[in-house]
């Protein structure tokens, strides 16, 4: 049975379906970057409200700025913008839900003017983003907006025909300002530290280059709430499509699969209204920082620990890595002994319970989360997920063998060869330069840690860290992952550099 509006009434009983009249829903949210995560997260919270008979003015219009977004747009359009959320977990209470919160999907390359008009329409009150780290055109090491990118220069020269997210947002806000229309809130839903601030800095940097008066108006009137978002959402595979079809009879060309867990903590700073998402589990707060640091350092940082060591051992799925007792012990030890001591108190959160939940989520056998997904884009992820913990340890003068092992494992992983002789691609925009540095025969450590856009200045300046990194890398190269894990878990590598030097 093909998924579309006409067939909704024929869905099996166990499949949830929209309980509202989709034709009556206005699109108050424009979401740029419709992928799996948005469809499994923000759209689901909105769907829950719509099913309660609320949020009728907060439907979603999707937007694609890249040519690659056409496949998603055409797929959803062929299904009347319906799709299936297919929860995968190890318990029996997982849900299958047809979602109708997205009511339209615009492609910038088809009609940029139509998109600008949509953004400038007073009905649009929130513009949300999942555009990944690279979409913010911000240098990872300096945090500065990169105005020299060709697409940015194009948008500054052609403000009526933009190509980038900031070109579109700025032109739409300029039109709203000229018409006396309130601005929209810009809400980043990307998995970035201080994501709202990152979006604000990028948009204001662009606007300043275009029109100083417009820059000042945006700075004084547009809200950019920070948010912590969480839901493990693997890439949809043909196996998932077949599994959904077999289980429910639904023929969905692009369902989204996700774990049962989801969480969203948002700063309550919206300049033009918002849905009452708190009624369906969203937590609003004055400051998202402690929640953000907890999630990014414990969940994402531990993912990095599991992923690179697991890949070297030949594991291909997260649950396989967590079934490896030696590796799962290392991951929990990293959480307990390295990350937790550096975290501030998180209001309303029991950290021990939170860590137990993470281990359970990582071990989910049904979701088959791919190690390759977790390993991808390490040059962007590690500076955000692991290096803050390492910097805290360097500043505190404490031993750092586990944190350093994660980075040494990444370096070793970049060779593209696991310990069973299997190969894998390096999925990273910087793959060529990273592999070149990781495969040097001489001065490997100095050159690898000299990648300033990854490690910055402070970390390579720590002689203790450099010596520990060298030791852990040599161990991986000569003894292998298991012996290195055993040594690391059995000892605290000390901060005495002379002692370290004798071990290398």
Regions found by a protein language model. Give the residues of each.
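Substrate/ligand-engaging "lid" and interaction regions
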Residues: 1-504
């Amino acid at each position: 049975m093909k998924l579309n509006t006409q067939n909704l009434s024929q869905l099996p009983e166990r499949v949830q379906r929209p309980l509202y009249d989709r034709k009556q829903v206005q699109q108050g949210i424009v979401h740029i970057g419709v992928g799996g995560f948005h469809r499994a997260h923000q759209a689901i919270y909105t769907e829950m409200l719509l099913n309660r008979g609320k949020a009728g003015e907060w439907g979603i219009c999707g937007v694609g700025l890249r040519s690659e977004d056409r496949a998603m747009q055409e797929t959803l359009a062929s299904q009347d913008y319906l799709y299936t959320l297919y929860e995968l977990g190890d318990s029996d209470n997982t849900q299958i839900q047809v979602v109708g919160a997205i009511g339209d999907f615009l492609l910038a390359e088809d009609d940029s003017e139509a998109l600008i008009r949509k953004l400038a329409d007073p009905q649009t009150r929130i513009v949300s983003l999942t555009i990944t780290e690279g979409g913010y055109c911000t240098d990872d090491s300096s945090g500065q907006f990169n105005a020299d990118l060709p697409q940015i220069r194009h948008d500054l020269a052609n403000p009526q025909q933009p190509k980038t997210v900031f070109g579109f947002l700025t032109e739409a806000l300029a039109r709203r300002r000229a018409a006396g229309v309130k601005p929209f809130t810009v809400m980043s839903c990307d998995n970035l530290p201080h994501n709202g601030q990152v979006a604000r800095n990028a948009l204001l940097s662009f606007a300043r280059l275009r029109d100083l008066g417009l820059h000042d108006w945006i700075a004084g009137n547009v809200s950019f709430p920070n948010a912590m978002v969480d839901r493990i959402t693997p890439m949809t595979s043909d196996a998932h499509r077949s599994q959904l079809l077999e289980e429910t009879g639904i023929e969905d060309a692009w369902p989204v699969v996700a774990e049962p867990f989801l969480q969203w903590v948002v700063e309550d700073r919206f300049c033009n209204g918002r849905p009452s998402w708190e009624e369906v589990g969203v937590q609003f707060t004055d400051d998202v920082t402690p929640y953000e640091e907890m999630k990014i350092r414990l969940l994402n940082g531990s993912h990095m620990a599991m992923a690179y060591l697991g890949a070297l051992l030949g594991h291909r799925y997260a649950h396989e890595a967590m079934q490896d007792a030696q590796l799962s012990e290392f991951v929990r030890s990293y959480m307990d002994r390295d990350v937790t001591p550096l975290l501030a108190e998180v209001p309303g959160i029991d950290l021990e319970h939170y860590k137990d939940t993470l281990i359970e989520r990582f071990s989910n056998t049904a979701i088959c989360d791919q190690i390759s997904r977790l390993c991808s884009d390490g040059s962007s992820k590690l500076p955000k997920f692991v290096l803050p913990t390492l910097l805290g340890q360097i500043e505190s003068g404490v031993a750092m063998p586990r944190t350093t092992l994660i980075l040494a494992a990444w370096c070793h992983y970049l060779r593209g060869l696991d310990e069973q002789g299997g190969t894998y691609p390096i999925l990273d925009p910087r793959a060529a330069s990273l592999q070149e540095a990781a495969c040097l025969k001489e001065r490997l450590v100095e050159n690898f840690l000299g990648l300033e856009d990854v490690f910055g200045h402070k970390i390579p300046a720590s002689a203790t860290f450099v010596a520990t990194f060298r030791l852990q890398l040599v161990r991986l190269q000569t003894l292998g992952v298991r012996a290195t894990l055993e040594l690391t878990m059995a000892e605290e590598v000390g901060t005495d550099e002379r002692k370290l030097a004798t071990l290398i």
